[in-house]
Amino acid sequence: MQIKQNISLKPYHTFAIEQCSHYLVEVGSVDELVDIYANPDFRELPKLILGSGSNVLFTQPFSGVVVVNRLSGKTLSEDESFYYIHAEGGEDWPNLVEWCVQQGIGGLENLALIPGCAGSAPIQNIGAYGVEFKDVCQYVDILMLDDFSQRRLSAEECQFGYRDSVFKHALYNQCVVIAVGLKLPKTWQANNSYGPLQEIAEHELSPMSIFHKVCEVRREKLPDPKQIGNAGSFFKNPIIDKAHWQQLKAQFPNIVAYPAGEQMKVAAGWLIDQCDFKGVQVGGAQVHPKQALVLTNAQSCTAQDIIQLASLICDAVWDKYQIALEHEVRFISTVGETCLSELRVES
């Protein structure tokens, strides 16, 4: 286990913005994880657990220790009705989904090509095309940071919500996700109700056909972070009450939204697109020309470029629709997590 000092974070997050961390260490086991958190030299320093860095924006140099989760490995077991997959927290999520499909195991195919590690999936409750992590989760294994005990949380204990979980609230900064357990029924049912997935002929429906269609759509709509720095969907789809929705529907008949319990989930990409932001650039940051929900590092951008562009978008959407956009991407300052509203106050 090598502890690096004053290291560039550019290779460790998909926005690929030049920013540095005072310390960085890659951990390959729970014991190494404990060693870092128990180290008296680091005890008073802020720490950040990082997986693939696919959902973060470093707004300033990080003054503490970035701990990169490299815990790897997966096991498969089964009974008459289910497949059970245990995946270590550092396992690459897209590779895990593809591996399952290749094994003939269905249930994860709608979540194909979502960048990140298995350990990040429950924190965000990742989701796409009608499926969320909570739908396939059996348990989440965590390391408590106060006494270094290990606990197994049931899906119910994780308190999953829309891009939300207990790890953003009661357990925020209290634990590290070291593994996840997935439970996938052997009696597979296609989830093809979303958009392009409906194009698959009924006789061709299979985990593999949905997997390929999801990959095709994502590659067509979303830029590859290896080619253009980005963190995927920058904003959450806002949830509004039905009264607000009906007012907007009367004024904007083509508004795109879906039921979310007693409320409505509005397509943030549509809102941003209708405010004419596709292709708009601030400094080196740009709204992707094909997908308004994605902000990119188009030309050696700075974090401030992204912040300014995101602020312009939020203001425009609020002025036109009275909807407050919330960023899905995590903002990391010099000592830990922050948010766009705080940064705007500071500036």
Swiss-Prot record:
It comes from the Bacteria. Gene3D superfamilies: 3.30.465.10, UDP-N-acetylenolpyruvoylglucosamine reductase, C-terminal domain, Uridine Diphospho-n-acetylenolpyruvylglucosamine Reductase, domain 2. Residues 16-187 form the FAD-binding PCMH-type domain. One of its GO terms (biological process) is cell wall organization. GO terms for molecular function: FAD binding; UDP-N-acetylmuramate dehydrogenase activity. Disulfide bonds: none annotated. The keyword Cytoplasm applies. Belongs to the MurB family. This is UDP-N-acetylenolpyruvoylglucosamine reductase. It comes from Vibrio vulnificus (strain CMCP6). The gene is murB.
